[in-house]
């Protein structure tokens, strides 16, 4: 049976929203480059120079004979770097990059990015830019089906999103525990509700924010499990959650990300499941790629976070990540 408890809005009041990137254009219709800086942390890290960089832009034909034809809107996650340069200086260099894009396929459709321009201020991000990178196409492009193979393509940077990593400690993405199941355990999940205000252009105002669309996504935190063959009650789990003193924020890791920090006491078992870290990061790029693409330039705000307590899925239940399931005749095999 599922039990749901609401967190108090004070848990995300300070850092629970992201400002939009409002599109503006030059006289010829080209988008004006912009940079957005997000700080989801509490500011207790001594060195404030670490940041995560995420580029947004247009995938277009690189043929110089005429005006480039835009094919799709895409993104390029550059990862974490350390820099004291101003955001505007980083944006300027990013817009001057010559980034080649190529469509290919592996387990799924991929986009390959590599840069041909020497780096100066963006040197801390050279690992992605100079050695090339491959991403799941649906995670970094809104319409990969429109990208041709017979015409060279480039990625023209238009927007830059910088997330300052100002929290002390590590930003842990607890990937190993996300599929962990246990007998007689209670799964602790979060249901997050966002209110979305898409970037509609300067000077346009929506009078009633209650009419804005909302979207939800769910993340798994961990499991509450007793040593004996008994199950914790929902009320007891709620008490343990309240003692954790969870604080929530929105960041720009991989597009949009949920940041969680425990400011209180965490159970030893759950703390171990989370790698003994109290600062967690859940990028929507890996949780819900469709919602993440929708939020690339939008204003979004947390309006509700709920703790969802559910019985842990039995271990004998198999997880099928493939549409091909083995059959008794051996006609199909998942390798």
UniProtKB/Swiss-Prot annotation:
It is found in: Virion; Host cell membrane. InterPro entries: Matrix_C, Matrix_N, Matrix_Paramyxo_C, Matrix_Paramyxo_N. One of its GO terms (molecular function) is lipid binding. One of its GO terms (cellular component) is membrane. Keywords: Host cell membrane, Host membrane, Host-virus interaction, Lipid-binding, Membrane, Viral envelope protein, Viral matrix protein, Virion. The keyword RNA-binding does not apply. Its main location: virion. It comes from the Viruses. GO terms for biological process: virion assembly. Pfam families: Matrix_Paramyxo_C, Matrix_Paramyxo_N. Belongs to the morbillivirus/respirovirus/rubulavirus M protein family. Homodimer. Dimerization is critical for virion formation. Interacts with host ANP32B. The M protein has a crucial role in virus assembly and interacts with the RNP complex as well as with the viral membrane. Associates with phosphatidylserine (PS) and phosphatidylinositol 4,5-bisphosphate (PIP2) at the plasma membrane. Interaction with PIP2 triggers matrix protein lattice polymerization. Matrix proteins induce host membrane deformation and curvature necessary for virion assembly/budding. This is Matrix protein. It comes from Measles virus (strain Hu2) (MeV). The gene is M.
């Amino acid at each position: 049976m599922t039990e749901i408890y609401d967190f108090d809005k004070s848990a995300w009041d300070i850092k629970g929203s992201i400002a939009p990137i409002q599109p503006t254009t030059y006289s010829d219709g080209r988008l004006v480059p912009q940079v957005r800086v997000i700080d989801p942390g509490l500011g207790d890290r001594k060195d404030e120079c670490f940041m995560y960089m995420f580029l947004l832009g247009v995938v277009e034909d690189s043929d110089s004979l005429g005006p480039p034809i835009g094919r799709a809107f895409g993104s390029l996650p550059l990862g974490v770097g350390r820099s004291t340069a101003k955001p505007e200086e980083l944006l300027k260099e990013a817009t001057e990059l010559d980034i080649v894009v190529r469509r290919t396929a592996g387990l799924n459709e991929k986009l390959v990015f590599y840069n041909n321009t020497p780096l100066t201020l963006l040197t801390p991000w050279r690992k992605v830019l100079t050695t090339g990178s491959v991403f799941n196409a649906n995670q970094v492009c809104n319409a990969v089906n429109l990208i041709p193979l017979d015409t060279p393509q480039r990625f023209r940077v238009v927007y830059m999103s910088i997330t300052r990593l100002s929290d002390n400690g590590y930003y842990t993405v607890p990937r190993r525990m996300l599929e962990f199941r246990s007998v007689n355990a209670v799964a602790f999940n979060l249901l997050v509700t966002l209110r979305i205000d898409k970037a509609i252009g300067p000077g346009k105002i929506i009078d009633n924010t209650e009419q804005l669309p909302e979207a939800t996504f769910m993340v798994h935190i961990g499991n509450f499990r007793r040593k004996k063959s008994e199950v914790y009650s929902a009320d007891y789990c709620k008490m343990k959650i309240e003692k954790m003193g969870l604080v929530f924020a929105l960041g720009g890791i991989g597009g949009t990300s949920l940041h969680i920090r425990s400011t209180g006491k965490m159970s030893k078992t759950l703390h171990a499941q989370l790698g003994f870290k109290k600062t967690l990061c859940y990028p929507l790029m890996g949780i819900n790629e469709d919602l993440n693409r929708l939020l690339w330039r939008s204003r979004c705000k947390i309006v509700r976070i709920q703790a969802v307590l559910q019985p842990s899925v039995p271990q004998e239940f198999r997880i099928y990540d493939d549409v091909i399931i083995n059959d008794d005749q051996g006609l199909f095999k998942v390798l």
